[in-house]
Amino acid sequence: NKPEELDKKDLKVQISINQKNSTESRSLGFRFRNSFMPDSINNIDLALSQMSYILTPEERKELKKLKQSDKENFFKKAWARRDPKPDTKINELMDEYYARVAFTEENFSRGTAGGWRSDMGMIFILFGKPDDIQRYSSMQSNYSYETWYYFSIGQEFAFIDDYGFGDYRLRYPFVY
């Protein structure tokens, strides 16, 4: 396995003792992972790609120049800068961010496209669960649309599914 994928690998240790005509075996399963990453992350390249919505332009430039061996360190430092409570062992913001990514993968994935890459996924990752959702569908045509409301920040986002396949796109571009 590649080292960047080993951090979540399910492993098993088996010990066998041969004594005279008898063999006794015991096994123990465990999971090895990096303590600075949430449980949902098992690939550093994917985790860094999923950070694209919050990376600064300078961080993006730096990331493009990195060797594979330097990516975990970049990940740690980028999240350390964003840690709302650096005195604790847990980075609450990182955990929430990747919980949202996991939600988008579960709810907004279409075909081979990851849910986090979808327009709905991007908005959900950046702003969380909407305060309210209005859904509309047209019986005469195939299109449907949804409007997500975020009252606390005074934002609303309209998504349109032009063809009725569940592929909702932002009606108006959003620059993050």
Describe every region a protein language model picked out.
Residues 7-21:
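Short, aromatic- and glycine-rich surface loops/edge beta-strands on solvent-exposed regions
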Residues 3-6, 23-176:
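Residues within mature, well-folded domains
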Residues 1-2, 16:
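Poly-acidic low-complexity segments
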